[in-house]
């Protein structure tokens, strides 16, 4: 299968199974589109009919182009066969290790964001803070179930984890004290709204955290529409200076300033540009996922605007890189030469199998977006996973699990998509969140184009 599209002056041909990317002229673009359904003679006739007025488009040139396409096909770089389906099933069945935990150290928050999927940090339950004892047991559980894997990921999440920062510090200290003995290397991520970041916190995060995720929706009026405290006051004026201090002192370590866009700001590229103009260079912006009846939910009529926004963003990134003002966008970080292995491309994030979320009480869920939904509770950190039926559902989530995905050119980029988004949109982790699919495919098209432009 190949996917062909035109963007920013490039004629792009993407081979689905091999991942090969080709940029071609108009004639070759049309020949590739005809190649599988027409004989060489038919292709020559149709191409001459369309391009025969051009001096360099002759029968011999067309036949030579067909030969080149055939050579690429034989080399597995065009119309290549997908031989990966069995790998998906075998890998998930054989993989029994846990590589990462999302520790919900705070089921409470100091912001009252109305679009929050976690019900202002409560996850449809009670407010709570994780104790050191539960967190310590979670780290031990991760080590016990990680097999021979050395690098382990731990995300400090909420709610707002800064409301339980002393426990965060003690857990990091504990992990560092045992990682040598256990032959493990912990990499910590910390997600914060930035409201109560102190210099002491920043110093600790910069020392210990491999990555920090900083929540900001962009322009002040956009951010302060949803991201408000319990008195209704916007957060922008508080968090932007805090984030600047953190990033400026981070010394090149990883971070993301991450926002959410809604129906209210479908011109979200302006929010990304605003964040870049503030001096932030590692950026992400996610579409809101919420019930379709919500006033801020994205609607079908928004799609053409959103597609255009992603294209505008890619072009702006090319422009700024040439000007010496580059920034990165998470969804455009596509490595065409040294990307993830085929197993990762097939199986995705590993939620429910290699990755789990831990509540303040030690309950296990497939990921943070399932926390509070009792039917998706997997077990707990004290007794382990006992809901193997649900875990097996997640083992089957891959690029080939859904019939709709089998004929999709983007399946080896999305790995079957986000199980949580599918569940919230369709009621099943085996469903297809079609709106999200359309956005994802547009992002991949832009990301590939961006790679082509930057490698010219």
What are these language model-derived features?
Residues 1-35:
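Acidic, low-complexity/disordered tracts enriched in E/D and polar residues
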Residues 304-338, 368-415:
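C-terminal accessory region of radical SAM enzymes
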